[in-house]
Amino acid sequence: MRLNRETIKDRAAWEKIGVRPPYFDLDEVEKNTKEQPKWVHFGGGNIFRGFVAAVLQNLLEEGKEDTGINVIELFDYEVIDKVYKPYDNLSIAVTIKPDGDFEKRIIASVMEALKGDPSHPDWERAKEIFRNPSLQLASLTITEKGYNIEDQAGNLFPQVMEDMKNGPVSPQTSMGKVAALLYERFKAGRLPIALLSLDNFSRNGEKLYSSVKRISEEWVKSGLVEKDFIDYLEKDVAFPWSMIDKIVPGPSEFIKEHLEKLGIEGMEIFVTSKRTHIAPFVNMEWAQYLVIEDSFPNGRPKLEGADRNVFLTDRETVEKAERMKVTTCLNPLHTALAIFGCLLGYKKIADEMKDPLLKKLVEGVGEEGIKVVVDPGIINPREFLNEVINIRLPNPYLPDTPQRIATDTSQKMPIRFGETIKAYHERPDLDPRNLKYIPLVIAGWCRYLMGIDDEGREMQLSPDPLLENLRSYVSKIKFGDPESTDDHLKPILSSQQLFRVNLYEVGLGEKIEELFKKMITGPRAVRKTLEEVVGREDG
C-alpha cells in the first residue's frame, strides 16, 4: 500500500495495520483553503509535519476549523519534490510513547506545498495567498540560523546585502522573502497578520521582527518601497513569541523498517543536496510543549487545547516557560550529561541514564534548580522535571549524543548554571556554598577542557567559540599532578561572562578547584569523584 490521497479513502485498510487515517473531508478543506487561506507555514521540515501540522489536524477532525495549511519551503526546495508532491502532501507521524509503543497517524492538514523561490511559478501563488484578506497567520520553523542576517562580528551576510540592494522583487534569503511577501500584503491594503516563529530559541518573535524590519528599512532608504511599509510592520503585523519543546530527530532506519513490515511502500529516507535528512514519515518523542503569545491582529485558529500541552497566553508567561526549561528543568541536565558523557566515553544520552551515578547527578542538578525555578504557572515545573528525568532522557529511540550537546558549552553556562547560582546568592534564605551538584558539573567542565578522558586518553572536544581561550588556561595543568592546578582555573571561575557571578565571591571557586583536583589525580578519577560526591547522601 502506498501513501496517497486515493489509498487513504480506505480508512479500514489503514486502521487494520495500526495507522490512524485522517477523519475529515479533504476535498472540502482543500477547496476552502484555496479560496480562503488562513494559515501559511514557512519551512516544511520534520517538527512542522510531526507537531505543528498535527495540531491543526486535530482542529479539522473536531470540526473547529475548515481550512488547512499552505506550506512555503524557503531553503531546500528538494523537500517539496521528494516528500510532499509524490505523497500528495501527506506524511505519517510516528510518536514513540514512553512504553516503547509506536502511535502512527497520517497527517493530512497540508493542502498546498510551494517552493519559496522567486524564479519559480510557485512564487506568484505565494504572493497571491499573502494578498488574501482571509490570511490570519504565517508560522515559521526555519531553525535559528534562518533568522540571522549578520555574522557573529556584526557584518551583514553578502546575500542579505544583495536583498537589501535589490528590494522585494527577487529576494534570496529567508528573511528577505518574508519581508517581500509582507510587502505584498501591505500593498493589498495594509492587511493585518501575525508572523509566528515556532523555532526553539529565546525571544524568537523579537528576532524575527528585528531581521524583517532591518531589511525593510534599507528598502525604504533606497526608495524601493513606500515609507509607510515600516509603519505597517509596527502597527498591523504582530510577531508573537513562543516556546516550543519537542524532540524530533531525523528519520530513523528502524522506524522505516517498521512501516515497511506493515506493508507500506515508498518509505525511503532522502538526503537532499543541502544535507536535509527527510522522509515521508516523521519519528518523534511523546512529550511536547507549545506556549504561544496570544497576539493575532486578524484572528487565529482555536489553538488553545488543540493538543497536549498547547497554551495561548501573554508574552511574560511565554518567557517564563522558556526560562523554566533552559535554566532549570531540561537544558542544565542535558549539559551535565554532555560533559560527563564525553569524559566517561558514552555515545548516547539514553545510555548515560542507565548509569546510576549520572542519573543521580542530573536528579541533583534538577533539585538544586527547582528551589529557584521561574514558575510559568501554566506548566508545573516539578512535573516537567520528572518527565525529563524519567521519560525523555532515558528514551533509547532518540539518538542524541553527549558530543553534540557539548557544542558551545561556554555559551550555555551563564543561562544553564549561572542564573541558578546568582538566584541562590540573591536569596537571603539560600547560600550558594550549599550547592553540591552544580559545582561538580562546573568542575567536570574544567576537567573536560583538558581534552583527556577518564581513562587518560586524548579526546576530541566539541566546537566552542571560546575553546582556544579556555584551553590556554587549562593547558598549563598536568594530568596526574593536582598541585599543578595552581591559579590556572581562576580566570575561568571568576568570569561573570561565564557564570553571571564571580564564583570565588559567592564561595564556590575554591570548592570547584578542589573537585577539579580530585578529577585529575589519574585514570578513572572522574568516576571516583562522582562516586564520592554523588554517592554521599549528605549535602
From Swiss-Prot:
InterPro entries: 6-PGluconate_DH-like_C_sf, 6PGD_dom2, Mannitol_DH/Oxidoreductase, Mannitol_DH_C, Mannitol_DH_N, NAD(P)-bd_dom_sf
A GO molecular-function descriptor: fructuronate reductase activity
UniProt keyword list: NAD, Oxidoreductase
Major enzyme class: oxidoreductase
Pathway in which the depicted protein is active: Carbohydrate metabolism
SUPFAM superfamilies (UniProt xref): 6-phosphogluconate dehydrogenase C-terminal domain-like, NAD(P)-binding Rossmann-fold domains
Physiological role: Catalyzes the reduction of D-fructuronate (D-FruA) to D-mannonate (D-ManA).
Name of the protein described by the UniProt record: D-mannonate oxidoreductase
Species annotation: Thermotoga maritima (strain ATCC 43589 / DSM 3109 / JCM 10099 / NBRC 100826 / MSB8)
